[in-house]
Structure formats: structure tokens, C-alpha cells
């Protein structure tokens, strides 16, 4: 049950408060001052310029949700190594959501002394993107010696995680 992970942007709340339908609606209203009772689909249409409203605020609302989602996925990935499938109605807005998700997954943390460290031990690739998918599938292998022998084997040191939407 990942909903109990913390919301990166508002740590007193669970992650569900930052990535749900109500989160998109609340964040758009806060950013735009728009008091209409809009659905995430309508907020997406505003972001696209197909509906009256504040497109920048609409895109930012999805970006904020993507940041929270990316942090939640990165936290889960620290424990569970696997492919990530993101579904649900909100994923229809993936063009505004996924850039922030990927920024979080491939972002950095800072150590107390100021040294940056990768957020995850692996590189995340957005498999819906042809370029990322090709990079994900391209090995970066080299030959290494098997300890205690003279044998060599092919080894790919790059840890990878694929992220795909449904």
C-alpha cells in the first residue's frame, strides 16, 4: 500500500494527497485562482489550450503531481527492484506528468557535507519514449575476469529501471 508513503511536497500528508484526482483539482485551483469545479480531464484540456483557463497553472499542477509520484516510485524502488507500470485515469496526462516523474527518478540527493548522490542506484528510462527505450535496451557491457580464474565474462555495470504507462 504505497498511499501511506509521504508526499514529498507536503510531508505531513500521504502520497495519495499529492497525486490523486483531488490533488490535481486542488493544485490547479490554488495555482490559478480558478473556482470552477473542474475534472483532471478538463484541467488537461486547459493545459492543451483547448479549454478556457490558465494553461501554465494546469501544466504546473500535473508537474507537481509528477514530482510526488516520482519520489514515491524512487522510494519503493529502493526496496523493490522491478519494472514500473503507471496506470489510472490520470496517466492520460502523461505528457505533463512524466517529465517530473523522470526528473525525480534520475535526480540527486545531497549528503550532509554537500556531496551529491544519485537518488536511485539505477538509471530510469521512460519506455514510452523511443529514444529512452532504445537506450534502455542498449547494453553498456564490457568483459571482466571472473575472480580466482582466468575466465572472462560479459558484464553490464549499468543498473536500469523501465517505466511505462498503460
Predicted region positions:
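A conserved active-site-flanking secondary-structure segment within enzyme catalytic domains
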Residues: 1-2
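ATP-binding/phosphotransfer module of carbohydrate and carboxylate kinases, centering on a glycine-rich
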Residues: 6-166
